[in-house]
Regions:
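Membrane-interface junctions at transmembrane-helix termini in multi-pass inner-membrane proteins
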Residues: 101-131, 141
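Helix-loop junctions and terminal segments of transmembrane helices
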Residues: 25-42, 52
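Alpha-helical transmembrane segments of polytopic membrane transporters and translocases
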Residues: 5-25, 56-61
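Residue-level recognition of transmembrane alpha-helices
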Residues: 12, 59, 96-99, 103, ...
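Short alpha-helical transmembrane segments in multi-pass integral membrane proteins
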Residues: 51-74, 80, 151-177, 191-192
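C-terminal transmembrane helix end/exit motif
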Residues: 159-210, 232-234
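Membrane-interface helix-loop junctions in multi-pass transport and translocation proteins
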Residues: 123, 133-167, 181, 203-227
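Interfacial segments at transmembrane-helix termini and the short loops linking adjacent helices
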Residues: 71-103, 213
Length: 234
């Protein structure tokens, strides 16, 4: 019964939040498809590279701070969304922090799959996902059985799998379009800004939480902290 409860808590709470950000970033992949298809038909690599670069930059600008925010504010976010389910929340705090980092890689890989299909290589996306799934399954078998790791092993295996999938999907897209990604603009700058954003958000949350005599609603504190962090980011 206990293993079922732990796994149910993980899939019902942490995995639910984990799937939100990629749903948003997937739209960027779809939005670029018409112009990408046109560029492919004209064999206009410059237009393809320009569109892909913009897509990767916008996706990173959204995915990196969102993922890091989930990682550092996992407990407040769980309480905000699933208040009253205390035992389940306690089970999911650490796994969701790990999944927060995994969100970044999944969110970046998701639109890349749509692009691979447009470029006429859907089998590459399937192969990459299958390989990532095998890695995840293998690590799940090893890690979840360790008592000290437990259900966090599922989150760790997801993180490793998503890193692998993201690297290969981005590499495939870049290779097929001869794109040399602007690492600084796509990854370094958003990551630095996201770190500042996350630090600001967690400090704001801890400060407001300690001011117990104000009796501030915890949902308001969470929203306010996210808002302050977002202001710092943008």
């Amino acid at each position: 019964m206990l293993p079922n409860f732990i796994y149910g808590s993980y899939t019902g709470l942490a995995v639910t939040v984990f799937g939100l950000v990629p749903t948003i970033t997937a739209m960027f992949g779809k939005s670029i498809l018409p112009s990408l298809a046109e560029s492919c038909a004209k064999n206009d690599k410059k237009a393809m590279q320009s569109g892909l670069t913009k897509m990767l930059i916008v996706t990173s600008i959204i995915a990196i701070p969102a993922g890091m925010g989930i990682a550092v504010l996992s407990e407040p976010i769980l309480r905000f969304l699933f208040g009253g389910r205390e035992t389940e929340i306690q089970v999911c705090i650490i796994p969701m922090s790990i999944l927060g980092i995994a969100v970044i890689f999944l969110a970046i890989a998701t639109p890349c799959f749509a692009i691979l299909q447009t470029l006429g290589k859907p089998h590459k996306a399937i192969i990459i996902m299958l390989a990532g799934g095998i890695i995840k399954l293998f690590l799940n078998i090893i890690l979840i059985r360790q008592p000290i790791i437990n259900i966090s092993g599922a989150a760790i295996s997801t993180l490793v799998s998503e890193v692998f999938i993201c690297v290969l999907s981005v590499r495939s897209v870049c290779k097929m379009t001869d794109l040399k990604p602007k690492v600084s603009e796509i990854f370094v700058k958003p990551t630095y800004a996201a770190i500042m954003c996350s630090v600001t958000a967690i400090l704001s949350h801890e400060t407001l939480t300690k001011i117990a005599h104000l009796q501030i609603n915890h949902r308001f504190v969470t929203l306010f902290s996210i808002g302050i962090g977002s202001t710092m980011y943008f």
